[in-house]
Amino acid sequence: MYEVDMTIVGGGLVGASIAWGLARSGINPLVLDGDDLDLRASRANFGLVWVQGKGLHAPHYALWSDASAKVWPTMTKALSDDSGIDVGLRQAGAYTFALSEEELEAVREDMESIALETNGRAPHFDVLNRQQTLERVPGLGPDVVGSIYCSADGHANALALFHALHTAMQKKGAAYRSNHRVQTIEPTTEGFILKGHGFSVISRRVVLAAGLENERLAPMVGLSCPLKCSKGQILVTEKSQTALPCLSAGMRQADEGGIMIGDSEETDSAKISSSSGISAVLASRALKIFPALSDLNVLRSWTGFRVKTADGIPIYDQSERYPGAFLFACHSGVTLAANHALIVAPQIASGKLEDDLSVFSARRFDAQQAE
């Protein structure tokens, strides 16, 4: 058994972002991570730095996402300085393509609702008909009737981000332990005792950033983390010599040249295997948008489970019963990485989350049940 000041449970994008941010703030956390075969959203990530459409009926989430996207370039520079790794950030805006007038109208209504709910502070967006879209994006198929464009959106190499955060956090002083799945957390008068197979840690403070495991661990420190099943699937093509003309909600070209196709969700499957039916739907929609993709072979497909809360909005919490315990859960680990590292981590270091983050507390679910 050994003693530390701060332990982060979980070494995915959320945990690593916070660990790097803490190390930059002068605190050297211990990061306890699970096994390589664990269900890791961080390694199945699409890599979007995305604002468009987020935060419908949750203006605080819409503005939080936008704020993080805006400071992503600042984070990228600092992360490159600390790790020597370029995470491939590209922020040139993105499109949501519609294959029917009804689809375009539904997206437009959502975007207008977000603009209204945020009092006009959400990023500007353009509603484009087919001709306007064609003037901006060449090579579209005949089924595309229009699009929504938002200049705030971008993408990055999610695996490079994962590697950069791990490299940077350790260079700045964080300690990392893989194959250290935490099984129990016991609050004490001095902090917390974390136990797993073959190890015990006494920690004065603890941060739960364990993804899907948060739901199990949260009650041990007087918190809750209600999650729902959200399985996504991604197709990846061979490397293309021709650049995809733009970024969109369901398609992005990786910096290595392959094209990633995604945007599916299964809510009733616990299997990690991919579905041929979903692959067919993803491929069909992609070809309707960009018919030229028919010249490319799909090389691989994978699935992942999003860390999606019961209402889809991040949970940021601190324990009232056991001071020193914090919890963070979200399915936007890439988009929100900048906020987690540059804003949230310093608050953890100070010992208290600021009041403006209280809207993300899981206590909101108690209030909803009481209504």
Curated annotation (Swiss-Prot):
Keyword Oxidoreductase tagged: yes
Listed GO CC annotations: cytoplasm
Disulfide bridge map: none
UniProt cross-references to Pfam families, sorted A to Z: DAO (PF01266)
UniProt KW Mitochondrion keyword: no
Keywords assigned by UniProt, alphabetized: Oxidoreductase
UniProt cross-references to SUPFAM superfamilies, sorted A to Z: FAD-linked reductases, C-terminal domain, FAD/NAD(P)-binding domain
Quaternary structure annotation from Swiss-Prot or TrEMBL: Heterodimer of a subunit A and a subunit B.
General function of this protein: Oxidative cleavage of octopine into L-arginine and pyruvate.
Protein name: Opine oxidase subunit B
Gene transcribed to yield this protein: ooxB
